[in-house]
From Swiss-Prot:
Keywords: Metal-binding, Ribonucleoprotein, Ribosomal protein, Zinc, Zinc-finger. Gene3D superfamilies: 6.20.50.180. Its cofactor is Zn(2+). Belongs to the eukaryotic ribosomal protein eS31 family. It holds the Pfam family Ribosomal_S27. The keyword Signal does not apply. This is Small ribosomal subunit protein eS31. InterPro entries: Ribosomal_eS31, Ribosomal_eS31_arc, Ribosomal_zn-bd. The lineage of its organism: Archaea, Methanobacteriati, Methanobacteriota, Stenosarchaea group, Halobacteria. A zinc finger (C4-type) spans 18-38. It comes from Haloarcula marismortui (strain ATCC 43049 / DSM 3752 / JCM 8966 / VKM B-1809) (Halobacterium marismortui). One of its GO terms (molecular function) is zinc ion binding. One of its GO terms (cellular component) is ribonucleoprotein complex.
Length: 44
C-alpha cells in the first residue's frame, strides 16, 4: 500500500497510530489492529 493511501484529503491520518510507538500506524486485520514495530495488538 503506498504511503499516501494512509492519509485522507485533509492530510490527516486515516488509521490509528500505535499508543506505544506513537509514530507507527496500526495494520488493519479482520479481527485486530497490529503494530509491526513493537507487536502491540488491539482485538476488535
Amino acid at each position: 500500500m503506498p504511503h499516501n493511501e494512509y492519509y485522507n484529503d485533509d492530510g490527516e491520518l486515516d488509521r490509528e497510530t500505535c499508543p506505544r510507538c506513537g509514530d507507527t500506524v496500526l495494520a488493519e486485520h479482520e479481527d485486530r489492529q497490529h503494530c509491526g514495530k513493537c507487536g502491540y495488538t488491539e482485538w476488535k
